[in-house]
Amino acid sequence: MREILFKYLPENAVTSCFELIKANNIYLRIVNERKTRHGDYRQLPNGQHLITMNATANKYRFLITFIHEVAHLIAFERFGRLIKPHGNEWKYTFQ
């Protein structure tokens, strides 16, 4: 997984992002670029977390989108599933 991350992330961000993936039991799926979204988070029925990310040549876009989706995961775990996707709880977490 680390080797794959080097293709999509700035080199200095790979270790931190890899640690986030391990610590939060994230299944990261990199897909062909979609026009409607850069990334997506959802919790699977088995409790594992799925983050789907567009494959992009822009490593900084990938990084910001990854952090954005991890913030959804953490906000939902801390505050429950009934919060608004980009509400105050998510904004607090994304900081």
What are the functions of these language-model segments?
Residues E69:
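Walker B catalytic acidic pair
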Residues M1-I64, L73-Q95:
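Active-site-proximal or metal-binding-adjacent scaffold patches in catalytic folds
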